[in-house]
Regions:
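Polynucleotide-recognition surfaces of large bacterial nucleic-acid defense/processing enzymes
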Residues: 1-117, 121-132, 140, 214-362
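Short, well-structured alpha-helical interface segments that form or flank functional binding sites
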Residues: 78, 130, 156, 166, ...
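Active-site donor-binding loop signature of nucleotide-sugar glycosyltransferases
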Residues: 85, 163, 203
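Basic, amphipathic alpha-helical recognition segments used for DNA target recognition
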Residues: 136-200, 208, 212-223
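Amphipathic alpha-helical segments
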Residues: 171, 201-226, 252, 416, ...
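Serine-centered coil/turn micro-motif
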Residues: 177, 234-235, 246, 409, ...
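Terminal accessory regions of large proteins
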Residues: 265, 275-278, 282, 286-465
Length: 465
C-alpha cells in the first residue's frame, strides 16, 4: 500500500509523527483543538521500587491498617488505595490494590534495595489522594480509562489525569470513545499507553455537547460502579444479590435482568458518546458509533458462576467475614463483635472441615445447608439445594452429594481464581485422596488454629477405630 502525502501536514499532529494513514479530518483535529495536556494534568505517580514489599491486594490486609473510605483514618493507616493498572475496563473499577504509605510514605521512600540504593520514585506527590481518572499503561486489549474518588495514590502502571469535574468527565468521555484509540494509533501502534502519548491527544471542547457528554459519562460511571461493587472482590461490596429474594431461582432471574439492563444501558451510553465525538471531530466517513458486546466491560449473568459466588458468600458468613444481619465487610481483623451476626452464628473455632462423608455436624456442607435454610426458609430448602446442584454440575446422586463434591473438589480452585492466588481462606489438605480437608479464615488465624485442625482429624480417626 502506498500513500501520497504532503509532509507539512504532519506538522499539525503533536510531535509530528509520520502517520501516513491519518485523514485530513483527523489531522485538522490537532489544529482545531488543544492537546490533552493543555486542558488537564496527566501524571506518572509512585514507583515503590519493591512491589512485593509495598503493594498488596486489599483483602490481604487487616482492616485495622486499611484506609479505604475513611479520610479520618489516614493518619493511623498503613495501606491506601493504589491505581496500578489492571485489565481492560472502562468507567470505574480495578480497585483492588493498596500501597504502604504509612507516615506519608517514609518507609517506601527510605527503603534501600538489593543494589544498596533507594529504589522508590514518589513522583507528583501533590496529586496523591485527589480524585481523577486512571488508565493502564499496558493493556492486552484497547485503551480504557476509569474514574476514581479521593483517597487514591497512583503508579507508573496506572497513571492518572486530573482536572475540575466538568473537564475531567468530558475528557474521560473522549478517552473511552473510539476516537481515542484511533488517535493513539498515530503515536503508538502497540498496546503500551504512556503519559507522553496521552498528553498529545487533541481535545475539541464542544459547548453544544459538553452537558450531554458529562451526563453520559456520569451515568456510565454509576453503572460500572454498581457492577464492580456487586462482587466480594470489591471493598465496597455489601451483600450478595441473591439474598433478598424468596428463592434462588427467582433471585437469579432478578439478577439476570439487572445485569442485562445495566449492560444495555451502558452500551447505549457508549454508542451515544461515540456518536457525539464522531460529530465533533467530523469523522463520520471513518468511524461508526457501534460498540461490540465484547467491549462493554461489565458483567453478564452466568448461572454457574453466580451460584459459585453465592456459595463463596455463604462461606464468608460461616467465618464471620460477612453477616446476614449487617451489610458490608464485618470482620477482617480488629475487634470481633458478636452482636453483628444474629441467628446465623459464625464458626467459633475458625476451622470448617470439608469431608467426603458426614463425619461432623458442622462440616462445610452442614453449615451451608443451614445457611440456605436461614436465608430462604425450610419450606423451599430442597428446591433451592436442587437448583444449586443443577447449576454446579458436579458428580453425585443427590443434591447434597453434588454440593459436597463441589466443596471437596472445586471450591478452593474457584476461591484462588476469585482472589487472584492470594486466598483469604487457607486450606489444610491431607493429600490427593481427599481424606481430610479444612478451611480457616486468615484474618481469624491464631497460634491455636493448627492444633484445632489436628484435634478435628483425631476425632475423625476415632470413628474408624
Amino acid at each position: 500500500m502506498f500513500y501520497l502525502k504532503n509532509i507539512e501536514e504532519f506538522c499539525f499532529i503533536t510531535g509530528s509523527p509520520l502517520s501516513f494513514w491519518a485523514s485530513k479530518a483527523a489531522v485538522n483535529s490537532f489544529q482545531d483543538g488543544k492537546s490533552l495536556a493543555d486542558m488537564c494534568s496527566p501524571k506518572v505517580g509512585l514507583q515503590t521500587g519493591d512491589v512485593d514489599l509495598f503493594v498488596r491486594k486489599w483483602f490481604e490486609c487487616s482492616t485495622e491498617n486499611l484506609c479505604l473510605n475513611n479520610v479520618i483514618m489516614k493518619e493511623k493507616s498503613v495501606w491506601f488505595p493504589y491505581n496500578n493498572g489492571g485489565e481492560f475496563r472502562k468507567w470505574y473499577g480495578n480497585n483492588d490494590e493498596v500501597v504502604n504509605w504509612k507516615d506519608d510514605g517514609i518507609y517506601v521512600i527510605n527503603h534501600i534495595n538489593k543494589a544498596g540504593k533507594k529504589g522508590a520514585r514518589p513522583q507528583n506527590r501533590d496529586y496523591y489522594f485527589r480524585n481523577g481518572a486512571t488508565w493502564s499503561a499496558i493493556s492486552s486489549s484497547s485503551f480504557s480509562v476509569r474514574l476514581f474518588p479521593e483517597g487514591f495514590l497512583f503508579s507508573n502502571a496506572g497513571m492518572a489525569i486530573f482536572a475540575e469535574r466538568a473537564v475531567l468527565y468530558y475528557i474521560v468521555g473522549f478517552l473511552n470513545s473510539k476516537l481515542a484509540q484511533k488517535y493513539l494509533g498515530f503515536f503508538n501502534e502497540g498496546l503500551n499507553y504512556n503519559q507522553g502519548d496521552i498528553s498529545k491527544l487533541p481535545i475539541i471542547l464542544s459547548e453544544k455537547y459538553i452537558s450531554d457528554t458529562i451526563d453520559l459519562v456520569a451515568n456510565s460511571e454509576v453503572i460500572s460502579k454498581m457492577d464492580w461493587n456487586a462482587f466480594e472482590s470489591s471493598w465496597e461490596f455489601t451483600k450478595h444479590p441473591f439474598i433478598d429474594s424468596s428463592n434462588l431461582k427467582n433471585a437469579f432471574e432478578k439478577w439476570k435482568r439487572e445485569c442485562e439492563n445495566r449492560f444495555c444501558q451502558l452500551k447505549k451510553n457508549e454508542e451515544e458518546i461515540n456518536r457525539i465525538f464522531i460529530d465533533i471531530y467530523g469523522l463520520q466517513n471513518e468511524l461508526g458509533p457501534e460498540v461490540e458486546d465484547k467491549d462493554i466491560t461489565i458483567y453478564q449473568a452466568d448461572l454457574q458462576k453466580d451460584i459459585k459466588s453465592f456459595i463463596s458468600y455463604a462461606v464468608g458468613c460461616m467465618f464471620g467475614r460477612y453477616s446476614l444481619n449487617v451489610e458490608g465487610l464485618i470482620y477482617a481483623g480488629g475487634e470481633w463483635d458478636d452482636g453483628k451476626y444474629g441467628d446465623f452464628v459464625p464458626d467459633k473455632d475458625n476451622v470448617i472441615p470439608i469431608s467426603d462423608e458426614e463425619y461432623f455436624e458442622d462440616d462445610i456442607l452442614g453449615l451451608f445447608v443451614e445457611f440456605v435454610k436461614m436465608v430462604y426458609g425450610k419450606e423451599t430448602l430442597e428446591d433451592n439445594l436442587a437448583f444449586i446442584a443443577s447449576a454446579l454440575g458436579n458428580k453425585g446422586n443427590t443434591s447434597r452429594e453434588i454440593i459436597r463434591n463441589y466443596f471437596l473438589k472445586d471450591f478452593y480452585k474457584d476461591h484462588l481464581k476469585t482472589y487472584q492466588k492470594r486466598p483469604i481462606y487457607w486450606l489444610y489438605d491431607s493429600g490427593k485422596n481427599d481424606g481430610f480437608k479444612a478451611l480457616v479464615y486468615m484474618h481469624r488465624y491464631t497460634e491455636d488454629t493448627t492444633g484445632i485442625v489436628v484435634l478435628i482429624i483425631c476425632i475423625k480417626c476415632k470413628k474408624f477405630i
